[in-house]
A protein has these predicted regions:
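Helix-start/capping segments and mature chain N-termini
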Residues: 1-28, 32-172
Length: 172
């Protein structure tokens, strides 16, 4: 979609090598791909899970029509800066767009539970269509709906989700 070159065979070989070099434990792998097709892998042990995940609502809004938001990129200075403002006990910051609609967390997709129904913001609100989000939508466990700050503050439960950590219950 963004015109990047990719040698899938070379990436698969590099990933297989990493699996053999890290046979025991739980690791996260970050693949960084340059426009030219050059890539690098970074492997790190996954941190211990935190039992009491806390989130905040970011004061800064995100543009709903930023085409890069639909792709996992390294262009994340705004998200990193907002997360850097908070103490270590804050796992994520939830962003709204300029219309006041919930977008996403700086590192996760957002889900709320209202009347037993799992809801997640619509892609038109400007968010990354994450792997875990897609899985929950395709399974019928969640549905898309435009959500607002008031929804976050008045629901039964809030969850964040990403492919690395799965579905995580959170609190303000």
């Amino acid at each position: 979609a963004l015109g990047f070159a990719l040698d899938e065979r070379a990436v698969a070989t590099a990933l297989t090598t990493q699996v053999h070099e890290h046979p025991v434990g739980v690791f996260r792998v970050r693949l960084s791909l340059a426009h030219s097709g050059a890539f690098k892998l970074a492997v790190a042990e996954l941190d211990e899970p935190v039992c009491n995940w806390r989130v905040v609502i970011a004061e800064e809004s995100l543009p709903a029509n930023d085409y890069l938001r639909a792709h996992k990129t390294t262009v994340r200075g705004r998200c990193d800066a907002v997360l850097g403002q908070w103490a270590e006990d804050v796992f994520d910051a939830i962003f709204l767009n300029e219309q006041g609609e919930v977008c996403e967390g700086a590192r996760s997709n957002v889900f709320i539970v209202r009347d037993g129904q799992w809801l997640t913001p619509s892609l038109k609100c400007g968010l990354l269509p994450g792997v875990m989000r897609r899985s929950l939508l395709e399974s019928g466990r969640a549905v898309e709906q435009v959500l607002y700050r008031e929804d976050l503050l008045s629901v039964e439960k809030i969850y964040l989700a990403n492919a690395l950590r799965g579905v995580i219950p959170v609190r303000f």
